A protein has these predicted regions:
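Short, flexible loop/turn elements at secondary-structure junctions
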Residues: 34, 98-100, 129, 200, ...
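A short, polar/charged loop-to-alpha-helix boundary motif
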Residues: 132-139, 243-254
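Conserved catalytic alpha/beta cores of large enzymes that bind or transform nucleotide phosphates
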Residues: 126-222, 269-273, 294, 300, ...
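Single conserved hydrophobic/aromatic residue that forms the stacking wall/gate
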Residues: 311-320
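NTP-handling and nucleic-acid-processing catalytic cores
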Residues: 50-151, 156
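N-terminal beta-alpha lobe that positions the nucleotide/phosphoryl donor
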Residues: 1-95, 190-201, 205-218, 236, ...
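Conserved metal-phosphate-binding beta-hairpin within the catalytic cores
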Residues: 46, 219-243
Length: 320
């Protein structure tokens, strides 16, 4: 991080940002984009760093170096080993993207397939207040919506299911604007928690865009979106192939039978359709990874990308 960027590269970055900002004090996201990212069988999602609400060219230059360095963080190295990629064969760029004011609006992720069952005739949309990282990281329980592709294409009411999430927290801009200090997490008002974060009209518009993107790429897609709280406009900020359910056979249905019965000690939103058993290990931070042994059931408060290190090194099951 202390190493200086090549002078010609730094000058090009400064000139490009000056053209983008036109003298305004704009907030940008500095995002990673690797040459091996978003392949049909390996998404690399969340393996490298992204920094939000970065302001000022000096902070942007530092954030770019942080992104470059994240190509060799622990989880990125472990993921490449797991997927069989040569370290030297993966290059990384840093994109500087003007931010949507979703900190005062909503954001989330949508899939052109049901991520639980693999049913491909719906668009599945998740939404919560504030910046989208909370949804992407699994740090918040978002609203969930299912939109029928057939009804959407027929011009009929297409929202067929809505699940109200707790949406207890949101990520917003912080007062500082440097990498690692530019965002903060605050509680969501009770009134907002108790109402859906998107209208039916907004859901239909997002779903239409999702189908356009899916048709363009010819593949089930994983799409990040954001709503500007100031203008009310919806934006697509990223799209990548969906790499899990879309690769499973559509001609096979697996069912699992629980052979023993016991007391229910906790319930939550299902993220899969399998049954696991083993010794429960509660992990409060990535620094407690050494607790986890092969076959354990890992319990964590959220699905942090760093936990992929545990999945790769030891076969485990995750409960968050």
């Amino acid at each position: 991080i202390e190493q200086e960027l090549p002078k010609d590269l730094e000058q090009e970055i400064r000139e490009a940002f000056a053209e983008m900002s036109q003298g305004e004090d704009i907030a940008v996201a500095v995002r990673s984009s690797a040459t091996a990212e978003d392949l049909p069988d390996a998404s690399f999602a969340g393996q490298q760093e992204t920094f939000l609400n970065i302001r000022g060219i000096d902070n942007i230059l530092i954030a770019i170096k942080e992104v470059f360095a994240s190509l060799y963080n622990d989880r990125a190295i472990a993921y490449r080993v797991h997927k069989g990629f040569e370290h030297a064969g993966v290059a990384l760029s840093a994109g500087v993207q003007r931010m949507v004011r979703s900190e005062t609006g909503t954001s989330g992720v949508m899939f052109t397939i049901d991520t639980e069952s693999g049913f491909n005739d719906v668009v599945f949309i998740t939404a919560s207040y504030g910046l989208g990282e909370m949804v992407v990281q699994g740090a918040v329980n978002p609203d969930e919506f299912y939109i029928s592709k057939a009804l959407l294409n027929a011009g009929k009411p297409a929202v067929i299911r809505r699940n109200l999430g707790s949406k207890q927290q949101k990520m917003v801009y912080a007062d500082e604007h440097s990498a690692g200090k530019s965002v903060k997490i605050v509680p969501v008002d009770k009134a907002e928690r108790n109402q859906f974060s998107l209208s039916n009209e907004e859901l239909v518009e997002l779903a239409k865009q999702a189908l356009i993107i899916e048709k363009h790429y010819g593949h089930a897609m994983d799409i990040e979106w954001a709503k500007d709280g100031d203008s009310g406009k919806l934006f697509i900020v990223q799209a990548r192939p969906e790499t899990v359910k879309s690769r499973e056979s559509q001609n096979v249905m697996e069912r699992y039978i629980l052979k023993e019965k016991g007391d229910v000690i906790c319930e939550g939103r299902s993220i899969g359709q399998r049954i696991g058993a083993g010794t429960v290990r509660v992990v409060n931070s990535i620094h407690e990874m050494d607790k986890v042994q092969e076959g354990d059931v890992l319990v964590s408060d959220m699905t942090d990308p760093d936990l992929s290190l545990i999945h790769i090194s030891e076969p485990t099951r995750l409960l968050s």
